[in-house]
């Protein structure tokens, strides 16, 4: 079959204008039971999203099959050609740009119009509409894979109503024995994962990612803690009325939990203003905890309260805890006035303390005399020991002195932590009278060690001659 009659009289002239050599179309045998094979000329095939070749796409030999692309991708690629520095259509048939083969040898449209590296980058980073396909999860995976680290995702909690659940995910990894953890929440598991990954990326690179379409449906509550900092996360919310409807999760419950963990008074809510027409009311509610105060506005009291709690929760996450100020604030909260030594300890005058009897006084005096006259080697060595040296095993030394002087040592861990979040411990010496010393530390073991150190200081003072 003559090529001019098959493709039309204008095809060779069009191919010549594009510097593309015409190809001889080989007829294909008709197969029974299959639709007739379609033949496209190069220009029509290019416009319809088919491979650019004189050979048929479907059923072609393996060496002559071509990549079939969507119209959107072809349009995006053709648009790139019009930019300065890009490959022009007049260069399509250049063998140097097409790998020395022009349109022959089974080279698809992507390989002809774009160099192979640019084609791979285009396909991997864009979709059919030319939009970025990278999500926070994929970006985090790419960042950590360079260091041979794979982040792990864990479903922590599902909260909210059955028809509107809120999923909370934790993403974590270890780098040189340093744990990194981030929390994220969303209306779907996918959204929660992306929120957690976004929070971790924000911390790692110190920059905010652009909002993705999946997270635009509502702000995602995310939080990040590094090496057990104890933070529960942060959230994105605005102070407007409608925007507050998109607040994810239960900020009122989170704030209540935070106050319980820190042993603070519970938050109090108070309606400040109520303005607007009856059908368009705008409420303002204040949330107060100790000396902190945050406001929330919304079209209903519920929305305003949630926003106020959310802002307070966010503020407390970012505010360092000052144990001294917190203690003064709590005392002022409980007593209704700022703490002062006279007011705070004034009630001690009214407390009835049992009177020291002569018999009990003699026992205490006898105990002190016995301690001072003790001749144990460990107890005598204690007088010459500097107890500020951290290399000393205080618990072991106290046990040796107790064995030598025949009294028992009992450690009592206190469940309640200090205002600064430290563990507490009491050590009891079964002497007469009973000696009790207190200790605190970042861990329960450190608290016991500190209590033993204070007990040794007590014995050192009582046995000084």
Curated annotation (Swiss-Prot):
Q: Where is this region: Necessary for promoting preferential binding of Dcr-2 to the less stably base paired ends of siRNAs?
A: 129-322
**In what ranges is there compositional bias, type Gly residues?**
228-242
UniProt-annotated stretches for the region Not required for interaction with Dcr-1: 1-379
Q: Where is this region: Important for homodimerization and interaction with Dcr-1?
A: 1-392
Q: Where is this region: Necessary for enhancing pre-miRNA processing by Dcr-1?
A: 1-337
Q: Where is the composition biased (Polar residues)?
A: 211-223
Q: Which SMART domains match?
A: DSRM
All residue ranges annotated as the DRBM domain in the record:
135-206, 250-318, 393-461
Location of region: Sufficent for binding to Dcr-1: 392-463
Provide the residue span(s) of the region labelled Necessary for interaction with Dcr-1.
340-465
For the region Disordered, what residue ranges are annotated? 210-246
Q: Name one GO biological process term.
A: central nervous system development
Provide the residue span(s) of the region labelled Enables simultaneous binding of both DRBM 1 and 2 domains to dsRNA: 209-249
Any Pfam family hit: dsrm
GO MF terms here are:
double-stranded RNA binding; RISC complex binding; siRNA binding
Region of interest (Necessary for binding pre-miRNA), residue spans: 308-309
Give the residue ranges for region: Sufficient for binding RNA: 129-211, 245-322
Instruction: Write out the domain note.
Output: RNA-binding DRBM domains 1 and 2 bind dsRNA while DRBM 3 binds Dcr-1. The RNA-binding DRBM 1 and 2 domains are able to bind dsRNA independently. The DRBM domains appears to bind to the RNA duplex and then slide along the siRNA helix to the ends of the siRNA. The DRBMs display a preference for binding to the more thermodynamically stable ends of the siRNA which is enhanced by interaction with Dcr-2. This suggests that the domains may also function to pre-orientate the guide strand prior to loading into the (AGO2)-containing RNA-induced silencing complex (siRISC).
Anything else known: The name 'Loquacious' refers to the mutants being 'very talkative' as they display a loss of several types of gene silencing.
Question: What is annotated about its quaternary structure and interactions?
Answer: Homodimer.
| Name of the featured protein | Protein Loquacious
Organism, by scientific name, is Drosophila melanogaster
User: Encoded by which gene?
Assistant: loqs
């Amino acid at each position: 079959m003559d090529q001019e009659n098959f493709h039309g009289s204008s095809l060779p002239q069009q191919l010549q204008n594009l510097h593309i050599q015409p190809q001889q179309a080989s007829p294909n045998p008709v197969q029974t039971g299959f639709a007739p094979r379609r033949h496209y000329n190069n220009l029509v095939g290019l416009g319809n999203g088919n491979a650019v070749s004189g050979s048929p796409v479907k059923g072609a030999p393996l060496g002559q099959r071509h990549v079939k692309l969507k119209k959107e991708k072809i349009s995006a690629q053709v648009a790139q050609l019009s930019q300065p520095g890009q490959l022009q259509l007049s260069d399509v048939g250049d063998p140097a740009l097409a790998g020395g083969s022009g349109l022959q040898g089974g080279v698809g449209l992507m390989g002809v119009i774009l160099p192979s590296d640019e084609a791979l980058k285009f396909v991997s980073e864009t979709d059919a509409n030319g939009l970025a396909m990278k999500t926070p999860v994929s970006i985090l995976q790419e960042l950590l894979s360079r260091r041979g680290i794979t982040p792990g995702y864990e479903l922590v909690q599902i909260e909210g109503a059955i028809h509107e659940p809120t999923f909370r995910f934790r993403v974590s990894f270890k780098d040189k024995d340093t744990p990194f953890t981030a929390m994220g929440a969303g209306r779907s598991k996918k959204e929660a994962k992306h929120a957690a990954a976004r929070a971790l990326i924000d911390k790692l690179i110190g920059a905010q990612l652009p909002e993705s379409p999946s997270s635009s449906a509502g702000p995602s509550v995310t939080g990040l803690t590094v090496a057990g900092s104890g933070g529960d996360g942060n959230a994105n919310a605005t102070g407007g009325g409608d925007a507050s409807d998109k607040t994810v999760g239960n900020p009122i419950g989170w704030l209540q939990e935070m106050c319980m963990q820190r042993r603070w008074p519970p938050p109090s809510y108070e309606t400040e203003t109520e303005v607007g027409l009856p059908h368009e009311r705008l409420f303002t509610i204040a949330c107060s905890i100790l000396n902190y105060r945050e406001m929330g506005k919304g079209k209903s009291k519920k929305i305003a309260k949630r926003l106020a709690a959310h802002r307070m929760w966010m503020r407390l996450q970012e505010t360092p805890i000052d144990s001294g100020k917190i203690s003064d604030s709590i005392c002022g909260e409980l007593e209704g006035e700022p703490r002062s030594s006279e007011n705070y300890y004034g009630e001690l005058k009214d407390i009835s303390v049992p009177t020291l009897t002569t018999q009990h006084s003699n026992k205490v005096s006898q105990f002190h005399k016995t301690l001072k006259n003790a001749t144990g080697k460990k107890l005598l060595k204690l007088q010459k020991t500097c107890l500020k040296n951290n290399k000393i095993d205080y618990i072991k030394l106290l046990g040796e002195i107790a064995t030598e002087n025949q009294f028992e040592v009992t450690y009592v861990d206190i469940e309640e932590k200090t205002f600064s979040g430290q563990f507490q411990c009491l050590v009891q010496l079964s002497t007469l009278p009973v000696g009790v010393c207190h200790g605190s530390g970042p861990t329960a073991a450190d608290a016991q060690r500190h209590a033993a150190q204070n007990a040794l200081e007590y014995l050192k003072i009582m046995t000084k001659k």
